[in-house]
Design a protein with these regions (language model features):
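Active-site cores that bind ATP or allylic diphosphates and position pyrophosphate for catalysis
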Residues: 4-289
Length: 289
């Protein structure tokens, strides 16, 4: 939505299978509706949702199930689904993921050390220097010195505090809530002694950890299920030479959020939620901002 409004014509992303046409075909199948009944049938046998969807796709389109079993392909297919659903004038460009697999350890490509983001997150910051550009490493070191990095203990307490302070009925209004998961969440937040424990208590075959983590953060931030599309383009950074392009954008664009939220009621609502998330983030850093 935002990229199309900005006038972008290509969406590039990494994929284990760098075949944009195949990923678009998979997206069309998932949007068609013909796969849903088969997914439900396979779920009834005890399969996880991810496995049921991949298996159903393989049944309907031999060879397509493989695309739905690898994480970057899955994300790329979601991008393609959004392009198709919105009728956006964007062409997907799938680039091969090389050197290190999603969620994997360190690797290399062409002699250059590579690492997944999840691998980097568990490394001490000084050990990042082999895997990131020198300029980026300097910025990370500066952020660490200023206490801007996440304090996981503060984050955990902040999330659990927000969840325990809310009435259970709030959870029914979250996006992605179904099948009574709001009741499970309401009970689990009273019993969990940490976020990992909470995710474990919530996990079912239909809801993988990644989805549950998003759900829990939505609940902590009190983000409702129904949100308008952002009615503005908030520019966080750009080359000076590129700024004139903003005048051709299909939505109001600028660097000052205080001005953008005055566009209308929807802009004010999105801006309010944005500010809430920024405040929450500021409390979860090594040095509270």
């Amino acid at each position: 939505h935002l990229l199309a409004a900005l006038g972008c014509d290509t969406l590039a992303f990494g994929a284990e299978t760098p075949d944009a046409a195949a990923l678009l075909d998979a997206a069309q199948l998932l949007l068609s509706g013909e796969i849903n009944a088969l997914i439900r049938k396979k779920l009834a046998t005890g399969m996880t949702y991810a496995a049921a969807r991949a298996d159903a796709a393989e049944t309907l389109r031999p060879g397509m199930g493989t695309l739905l079993r690898t994480p970057n392909n899955i994300l790329g297919i979601e991008y393609c689904k959004a392009i198709l659903a919105q009728g956006a004038a964007l062409t997907p460009l799938a680039l091969p993921r090389l050197g290190a697999a999603h969620g994997g350890g360190a690797g290399e490509h062409g002699g250059t050390p590579m690492a997944s983001a999840s691998y980097l997150r568990v490394l001490p910051l000084p050990e990042w220097t082999s895997f990131v550009p020198a300029g980026a490493a300097a910025l990370y070191a500066k952020a660490a010195a200023e206490g801007l990095l996440l304090d996981s203990a503060k984050f955990e307490v902040a999330v659990l505090t927000q969840l325990r302070m809310q009435p259970p009925e709030n959870f029914a209004q979250l996006r992605g809530i179904s099948e009574g998961l709001e009741n499970r969440l309401a009970a689990s937040v009273r019993q969990a002694d940490g976020l990992d424990d909470l995710y474990t208590r919530l996990k079912t075959k239909r809801y993988p950890h990644a989805r549950l983590r998003r759900l829990v953060l939505d609940a902590a931030l009190q983000f409702p299920a129904e949100l308008p599309m952002p009615p503005y383009l908030h520019v966080l950074g750009a080359r000076k030479s590129a700024l004139p392009r903003l005048k051709y954008a299909a939505l109001p664009a600028g660097t000052a959020l205080a001005e953008l939220v005055q566009v209308g009621p929807q802009a004010a609502e999105i801006g309010r939620l944005h500010s809430r998330a920024v405040d929450f983030s500021s409390l979860c850093r090594e040095k509270i901002q």
